[in-house]
């Protein structure tokens, strides 16, 4: 699955956060560390993504909105 970076950026802006603020909350001293990820220049790791989503106020159950390829749930036989 691929992270929808446009959605990530839109949600950050909707929450009123700057790249500097997100980077700071991630514990990074430089905005560029976050900006490179948001712009697709550096891959976002699983733990980084979970932390960014949490900073934006999303629970783990809501993370699916950030993925471009949603896999349908498998139906289990009764």
Task: Enumerate the predicted regions with their spans.
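Short, basic-rich loop-to-helix N-cap that marks the start of a DNA-contacting helix
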Residues: 41-54
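A short, Lys/Arg-rich alpha-helix, primarily the initiator
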Residues: 1-14
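Residue-level signal for the short linker/turn that defines the boundary of a DNA-recognition helix
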Residues: 6, 17, 29, 44-47
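The alpha-helix within a helix-turn-helix
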Residues: 12, 23-24, 53
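Short alpha-helical DNA-recognition segment
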Residues: 16-36
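Residues within the helices of the helix-turn-helix
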Residues: 9, 20, 50
């Amino acid at each position: 699955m691929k992270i929808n970076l446009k959605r990530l950026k839109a949600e950050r802006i909707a929450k009123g956060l700057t790249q500097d603020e997100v980077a700071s909350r991630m514990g990074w001293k430089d905005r560029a560390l976050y900006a490179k990820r948001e712009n697709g220049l550096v891959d976002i790791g699983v733990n980084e993504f979970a932390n960014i989503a949490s900073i934006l106020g999303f629970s783990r159950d809501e993370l699916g909105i950030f993925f471009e390829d949603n896999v349908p749930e498998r139906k289990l036989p009764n």
